[in-house]
């Protein structure tokens, strides 16, 4: 049996999509030294080649791809979006605005000067900033009629120009941002590690980027004469065992009766006590606890140690420091703090925001008691609330249909902004109501990534047919402008942050990369700083930058 592969792919668009995705994702794993191409570039390269070979793609699939992507971006931003302006919030907003306003101005004037075709400039700007939301916003403005297509062009040609501009500029934007992260600290003679240490001392944060996480363990000891001598008649509160070692007494057996001791309890000879703590905490116990006194008793040691992810919800906790939680009162152990999917530097003086996720371990009832105080335990269900997911998706589309008229001018939000807003609403409500709108993070990541990959396939196949023609005609101009638009806004943001806002350099670099939403560069800065301190800045600008970039895409295509 003979199979015409070309004909098969042309007649089966779904098969074509997944063939392109499979090849592209494999290419994305290729590394050049420490630089990995990444999924977006791999899929983009593959789809460009396939597009050049004459394969095409259904526009409806492209549309649903970008709609799912932008909706999921909103859901992820929702929990932290309204609390982002705590502490350094105005700085993060200013940096995001500097990057985008400078990029828009440079794109507009350079494109006007060189006479780039309509749509090329918006696509180029999206690629130069490696910001798919810009491309989404621009394309949606065209589809919804917010942006007027020139009379000598049709919508298909403009979308093609968008795709070509994005494809030619994307690699330039990615490489330039990675080079910025590598070179600017050296050229400015900035020691990011010292900057991270400085902010850590000011705010009481840990700087270690490589931290091992253990579960607490339980050990039981019999109280003997040596331990009674050591306690000197003090009660448990006065002894401060937790403050000194990190262990706490979870159970005590006296005269055969098991009980949970309070702070007023005084140890007596013959008591058997169960202590919970990390392995190194047990090692810090006074020798009078351990020397020949360990007890192996099933009932005494039968404690259920759990590890839970607690989402911060309480208004009384948001905006306060981690130390205000008084974890020692609950006998709980903090393993890590995650904000906007970024692991934060962890120590007692970090300021908490709504939507932060605290990974806490300890005896089950104690962990649940802590969760009731600060928020709720993240649902460990694999089932998503598809009713809420779909309902808010519909709401976003309805938002996009709203049109406002000012005199002779009509203006609407469009699908991109509408879905972004409804996604933020769902994410925010989910952070405040644990049983509503739950979507497992893995499922959300898959939908977002798959939507983005569908979108990339459509972009590449649309641009591939004319990519070499455009490269020979305007390739040098587009690549040159892309380099300018990629580098100068970041440089201006650095100057503003360093000299006008006087930001700590470790936070500043993280914030600039967050404003560019460029995760690969974030890893490089963390490596330079030998710390996760820059992640504080990244998390600060990331959510607001995603929102502003979608609006910027709509704006740049309207003024082009």
Curated annotation (Swiss-Prot):
<feature type="transmembrane region" description="Helical">
    <location>
        <begin position="450"/>
        <end position="470"/>
    </location>
</feature>
<dbReference type="GO" id="GO:0005886">
    <property type="term" value="C:plasma membrane"/>
</dbReference>
<dbReference type="InterPro" id="IPR036721">
    <property type="entry name" value="RCK_C_sf"/>
</dbReference>
<feature type="transmembrane region" description="Helical">
    <location>
        <begin position="386"/>
        <end position="406"/>
    </location>
</feature>
<keyword id="KW-1003">Cell membrane</keyword>
<keyword id="KW-1133">Transmembrane helix</keyword>
<feature type="transmembrane region" description="Helical">
    <location>
        <begin position="37"/>
        <end position="57"/>
    </location>
</feature>
<keyword id="KW-0472">Membrane</keyword>
<dbReference type="GO" id="GO:0008324">
    <property type="term" value="F:monoatomic cation transmembrane transporter activity"/>
</dbReference>
<feature type="transmembrane region" description="Helical">
    <location>
        <begin position="478"/>
        <end position="498"/>
    </location>
</feature>
<protein>
    <recommendedName>
        <fullName>Putative transport protein VS_1837</fullName>
    </recommendedName>
</protein>
<feature type="transmembrane region" description="Helical">
    <location>
        <begin position="5"/>
        <end position="25"/>
    </location>
</feature>
<feature type="transmembrane region" description="Helical">
    <location>
        <begin position="409"/>
        <end position="429"/>
    </location>
</feature>
<dbReference type="GO" id="GO:0006813">
    <property type="term" value="P:potassium ion transport"/>
</dbReference>
<dbReference type="InterPro" id="IPR006037">
    <property type="entry name" value="RCK_C"/>
</dbReference>
<dbReference type="Pfam" id="PF02080">
    <property type="entry name" value="TrkA_C"/>
</dbReference>
<keyword id="KW-0677">Repeat</keyword>
<dbReference type="InterPro" id="IPR050144">
    <property type="entry name" value="AAE_transporter"/>
</dbReference>
<dbReference type="Pfam" id="PF06826">
    <property type="entry name" value="Asp-Al_Ex"/>
</dbReference>
<feature type="domain" description="RCK C-terminal 2">
    <location>
        <begin position="293"/>
        <end position="376"/>
    </location>
</feature>
<keyword id="KW-0812">Transmembrane</keyword>
<feature type="transmembrane region" description="Helical">
    <location>
        <begin position="91"/>
        <end position="111"/>
    </location>
</feature>
<feature type="domain" description="RCK C-terminal 1">
    <location>
        <begin position="203"/>
        <end position="292"/>
    </location>
</feature>
<dbReference type="InterPro" id="IPR006512">
    <property type="entry name" value="YidE_YbjL"/>
</dbReference>
<feature type="transmembrane region" description="Helical">
    <location>
        <begin position="506"/>
        <end position="526"/>
    </location>
</feature>
<keyword id="KW-0813">Transport</keyword>
<feature type="transmembrane region" description="Helical">
    <location>
        <begin position="155"/>
        <end position="175"/>
    </location>
</feature>
<feature type="transmembrane region" description="Helical">
    <location>
        <begin position="539"/>
        <end position="559"/>
    </location>
</feature>
<feature type="transmembrane region" description="Helical">
    <location>
        <begin position="66"/>
        <end position="86"/>
    </location>
</feature>
<comment type="similarity">
    <text>Belongs to the AAE transporter (TC 2.A.81) family. YbjL subfamily.</text>
</comment>
<dbReference type="InterPro" id="IPR023017">
    <property type="entry name" value="Transp_YbjL_put"/>
</dbReference>
């Amino acid at each position: 049996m003979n199979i015409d592969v070309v004909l098969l792919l042309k007649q089966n668009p779904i098969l074509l999509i997944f063939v392109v995705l499979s090849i592209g994702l494999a290419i994305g794993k290729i590394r050049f030294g420490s630089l990995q191409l990444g999924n977006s570039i791999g899929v983009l390269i593959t789809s460009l080649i396939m597009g050049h070979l004459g394969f095409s793609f259904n526009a409806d699939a492209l549309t649903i791809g970008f709609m799912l992507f932008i909706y999921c971006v909103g859901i992820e931003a929702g929990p932290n979006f309204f609390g982002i302006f705590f502490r350094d919030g105005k700085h993060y907003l200013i940096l995001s605005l500097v990057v985008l306003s400078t990029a828009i101005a440079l794109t507009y004037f350079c494109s006007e000067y060189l006479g780039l075709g309509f749509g090329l400039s918006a696509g180029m700007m999206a690629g130069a900033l490696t910001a798919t939301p810009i491309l989404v916003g621009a394309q949606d403005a065209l589809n919804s009629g917010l942006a007027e297509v020139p009379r000598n062009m049709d919508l298909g040609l403009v979308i093609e120009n968008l795709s070509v501009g994005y494809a030619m500029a994307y690699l330039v934007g990615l490489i330039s941002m990675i080079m910025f992260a590598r070179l600017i600290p050296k050229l400015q003679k900035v020691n990011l590690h010292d900057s991270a240490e400085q902010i850590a001392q000011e705010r009481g944060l840990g700087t270690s980027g490589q931290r091992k996480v253990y579960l607490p363990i339980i050990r039981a000891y019999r109280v003997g004469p040596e331990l009674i001598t050591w306690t000197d008649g003090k009660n448990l509160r006065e002894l401060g065992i937790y403050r000194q070692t990190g262990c706490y007494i979870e159970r005590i057996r006296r005269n055969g009766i098991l009980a949970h001791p309070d702070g007023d309890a005084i140890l007596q000879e013959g008591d058997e006590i169960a202590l919970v703590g990390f392995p190194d905490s047990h090692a810090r116990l006074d020798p009078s606890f351990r020397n020949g006194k360990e007890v192996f008793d099933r009932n005494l040691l039968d404690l259920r140690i759990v590890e839970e992810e607690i989402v911060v919800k309480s208004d009384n906790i948001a905006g306060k420091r981690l130390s205000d939680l008084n974890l020692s009162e609950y006998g709980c152990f903090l393993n890590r703090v995650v904000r906007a999917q970024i692991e934060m530097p962890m120590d007692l003086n970090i300021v908490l925001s709504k939507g932060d996720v605290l990974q806490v371990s300890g005896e089950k009832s104690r962990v649940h008691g802590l969760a009731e105080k600060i928020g709720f335990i993240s649902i460990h269900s694999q089932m998503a609330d598809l009713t809420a997911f779909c309902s808010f998706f519909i709401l976003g589309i309805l938002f996009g249909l709203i049109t406002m008229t000012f005199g002779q001018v009509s203006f609407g939000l469009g699908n991109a902004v509408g879905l972004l807003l409804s996604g933020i609403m769902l994410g925010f409500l989910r952070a405040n109501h644990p049983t509503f709108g739950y979507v497992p993070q893995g499922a959300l990541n898959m939908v977002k990534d798959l939507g983005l990959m569908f979108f990339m396939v459509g972009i590449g196949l649309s641009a591939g047919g004319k990519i070499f023609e455009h490269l020979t005609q305007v390739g040098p101009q587009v690549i040159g402008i892309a380099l300018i638009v990629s580098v100068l806004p970041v440089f201006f943001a650095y100057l503003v942050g360093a000299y006008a806002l006087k930001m700590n350099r470790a936070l500043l670099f993280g914030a600039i990369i967050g404003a560019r939403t460029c995760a690969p560069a974030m890893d490089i800065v963390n490596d330079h700083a030998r710390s996760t301190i820059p992640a504080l800045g990244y998390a600060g600008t990331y959510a607001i930058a995603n929102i502003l970039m979608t609006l910027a895409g709509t704006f740049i295509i309207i003024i082009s």
